[in-house]
Structure formats: C-alpha cells, structure tokens
C-alpha cells in the first residue's frame, strides 16, 4: 500500500499539477507510513547531495501557483525557443558520422555512455536471472473479443542477497481465436489499490473503445507490466527493489541506475518471457507508457533493440522533452526530492552548480538511440502544458538525421504542427491531442502508425 500511495500522491501533486484529481483520504496508518517514507526519501536525497558535494539545488518550477516567484514558465519567448543542442552525428573527437557503421560502432556507444553516467545510471553487469511463472490462466471476453489472460510473476534470483525479494508482476492478454503468434503492446501500468478513488469521469466525454479493445480489434495482444513490482517510485525505496537487491541494501553510487532504468530493465525481462511464449510474436513487441512511465518506455526502447516500436505519452522532462527548454517541468524538478530517484545521482549536478548547457547529451539523442525503429511521441493540450509538447516535438524532429542515415524517415518537418495534426508518414511520429494529461485520444493514431510495422 505504501508504494501505491506515494505514487498517487506524487502523480497528483508533481507530475500533472494542473489536473483536477481527487486526493484519496488516508487512514492514520497510511499517514504514518507516508511520513516515514518521506523522511527516508529526504535523507537519501541529502546523502546523494553530500556524495556529489552539492550544498543546494536551484528552486523547482511551481506548476500549481502561476503567481509564485518560481512559477513554471509557459511563455514560448522565454522557453529557450532555439536551443543549441549537442550534435548527434559528431564524434567526441570532432569527426562527422557519415555511415551507418560509424553510428552503430562509434557514435551510438558514446551517447549511451553519457546517458549511463550522467542521466539514467548504469545497469549492473551481473543482474540476476528472472524465472517466469504462469500463476493463472483465464478465458474470458473483452467486449466482443474472446481472450486468454495469463497472470505471470517473474521471480528475480535473490540468492546473492536473500533479504530482498523481487517478483515482477505482469498480465498477458491474447485473442483466443488467433491462428498464429500475435504482436503485443506492453504497457507500464498502474493498479489503484482497494479503497482508493479513481479520478472522476468526465460526464460529457464520449464512450470510446478502450486502448486494449482497439488493440484486440487489430488482432494484437497486450500486456500490463507493473513497474512498482520492479522498483518503488520513491527515494526511500532505492535500498529495496532490484536496485536495492543489486546494492545489497546499501545506498547508491552517483552513477548507479535510477527507477526509470530499473523499470526499463524489467520491461526487457518481460520481453525475455515473450520470446518463450508460443502465443506471442516476439519480433513485434511494442512498449508504451504515460507520464513518468512514458519516460520509462522511451528509455526501454532506446536501450533494448528487441522492442519493435514505442508509444511515448506525455513523458516530459527526463523523457522526450529537451532538457534545454524552460517550459513546465524542468531539470530542477526532476533533481528534487520527489523525482530524483528516477535518475542517476549524477543528474542532480545539473540543478546546481551545473546547468543544462553542461549536459553532454539531450533527449533528441535518446530518441536517436531508438533508430531505425519507429517512435511515436504523444501529448495533450490543456491540462498537459507541464510536459512541453513542443519540446518533445523538437527532440523527435532533431533525431531525424539519424533515421535518415539508417535509411528511414524522420518527422519530415521542423515546424510544430497545429493541434490534433497527425505526423505519422515517417518513422518518428507525433501528435498533440486537444485533451489533457492522458494517452487515450492518441491511441487510434498510434495504432494507425503501428499497423505498417505490425503487418
């Protein structure tokens, strides 16, 4: 319960501050757990600052009070509209990358090293084996489609440190009437704990098929992977989960992996399972996530070349948004005590004393690491300003030169499109819908984008 509670509170107050979500009432026991977790998180955050020799961080952007001195910026003229970005096709020795071989053998490893060291952290080389167990199978219906639902647990080998146990939770759903292995869209999901209220539904919203039903209508399957069964979404949990298991319950080093990288690692372990399941076409596995899980989806796609496609929804700072943009959520927010656990400790340096101009990489290079595989970047409008749709578009557009080097197509434009314009003719797609902080309105466009790859 503690993990779920912290995720929900952080999401409501940090990730999408302009949304009218209801904060569920907590019991006194839950209040006590929350306070203890926050205290432990602050202590871990302070310990990392001490390790880095940082006395203080710059103030975070305030997305809740537009009159605050540190109010989040939503003025394009003040957003660094023409950022100077690190060159994606120039080696560190200054030589230009002109061939696919040079990109794959030389430049790509340079970029990965920078992201490992400074942004997302390094995955240990000796990560343990995961043994997947099917703990239940259910034949049922989703709408009018008969489905087979497998409930799975991925048991992480903890023989090196039995004090910490990690079981990765996932469900896999495939059409019962499929005559051959099917593509699968994998989502970083979230389950509301019993007793917690979901956000109120919009009574004026039209009732559309769920994304799962839309996927099934194409003959595909879907999987829901619970990231918090891999690693907690708070700083207090960094000595637990897969990160804690690898560190034997000790604190992180400055370049150790954060939660985003850990969740992405878990997605790769799910893909390991898909490669063994006769119902699944393991060459056609997509990864999708929204908000913080959109960040994780992009990281998973960038690091694991087995993922065929990704839908990155409202990922914002730390995801597809350019770090070198002052719009909505910024580096200082992600380096703060509510979000720092997503990243390597080293990332905190760029919120004090360093700045975004000191970063060796930016998010256009993260998108470029996915090439030549297709990436779809989505965002909303009102209620989703925090994630900087334009900054994410700019990153996708700037990655295009790598796609073109590898014989594919980028977005095809550097001009930010009008609202609800679908850019899906290239291998980097983009759409900003008119809704808020939700992936739902972009699912039909993503599916249209994905069809040409899942044929």
Spans of features found by a protein language model:
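Bacterial Sec-dependent N-terminal signal peptides
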Residues: 1-25
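N-terminal cap/lid segment of alpha/beta-hydrolase-fold proteins
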Residues: 122-184
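Primarily recognizes the serine-hydrolase "nucleophile elbow" in alpha/beta-hydrolase
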Residues: 192, 196-200, 269-330, 339, ...
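Mobile cap/lid helix-loop segments that gate and shape the active-site cleft of serine hydrolases
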Residues: 309-366, 388, 392-413
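C-terminal catalytic histidine-bearing segment of alpha/beta-hydrolase fold enzymes
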Residues: 342, 390, 396-455
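Conserved strand-to-loop "acid loop" that flanks and positions the catalytic carboxylate
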Residues: 371-389, 433-435
């Amino acid at each position: 319960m503690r993990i779920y509670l912290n995720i929900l509170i952080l999401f409501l107050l940090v990730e999408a501050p302009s949304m009218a979500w209801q904060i569920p009432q907590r019991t006194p026991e839950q209040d006590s757990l929350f306070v203890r977790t926050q205290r432990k998180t602050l202590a871990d955050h302070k310990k990392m600052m001490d390790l880095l020799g940082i006395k203080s961080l710059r103030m975070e952007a305030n997305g809740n009070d537009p009159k605050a001195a540190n109010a989040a910026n939503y003025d394009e003229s003040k957003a660094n509209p023409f950022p100077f970005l690190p060159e994606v096709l120039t080696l560190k020795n200054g030589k230009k990358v002109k061939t696919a071989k040079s990109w794959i053998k030389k430049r790509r490893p340079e970029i990965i090293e920078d992201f490992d060291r400074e942004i997302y952290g390094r995955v240990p080389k000796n990560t343990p084996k995961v043994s997947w167990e099917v703990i239940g199978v259910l034949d049922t219906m989703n709408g009018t489609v008969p489905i087979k639902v497998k409930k799975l647990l991925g048991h992480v080998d903890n023989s090196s440190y039995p004090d910490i146990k990690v079981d990765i939770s996932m469900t896999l759903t495939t059409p019962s009437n499929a005559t051959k292995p099917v593509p699968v869209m994998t989502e970083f999901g979230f389950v509301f704990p019993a007793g917690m209220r979901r956000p109120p539904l919009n009574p004026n919203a039209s009732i559309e098929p769920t994304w799962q039903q839309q996927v099934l209508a194409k003959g595909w399957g879907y999987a829901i992977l619970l990231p918090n069964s891999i690693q907690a979404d708070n700083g207090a949990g960094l000595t637990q989960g897969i990160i804690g298991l690898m560190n034997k319950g000790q604190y992180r080093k400055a370049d150790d992996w954060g939660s985003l990288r850990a969740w992405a690692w878990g997605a790769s372990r799910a893909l390991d399972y898909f490669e063994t399941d006769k119902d699944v076409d393991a060459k056609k596995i997509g990864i999708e996530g929204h908000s913080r899980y959109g960040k994780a989806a992009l990281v998973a796609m960038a690091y694991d070349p087995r993922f065929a496609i990704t839908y990155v929804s409202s990922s914002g700072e730390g995801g597809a948004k350019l770090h070198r943009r002052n719009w909505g959520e910024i580096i200082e927010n992600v380096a703060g005590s509510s979000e720092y656990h997503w990243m390597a400790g080293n990332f905190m340096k760029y919120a004090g004393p360093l700045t975004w101009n000191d970063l060796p990489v930016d998010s256009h290079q993260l998108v470029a690491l996915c090439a030549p595989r297709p990436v779809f970047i989505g965002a909303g409008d009102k209620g989703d300003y925090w994630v900087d749709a334009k900054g994410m578009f700019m990153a996708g557009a700037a990655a295009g030169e790598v796609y073109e080097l590898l014989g594919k197509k980028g977005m095809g434009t550097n001009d930010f499109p009008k609202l609800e314009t679908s850019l899906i003719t290239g291998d980097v797609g983009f759409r900003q819908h008119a809704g808020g902080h939700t992936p739902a309105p972009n699912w039909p466009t993503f599916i249209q984008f994905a069809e040409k790859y899942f044929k």
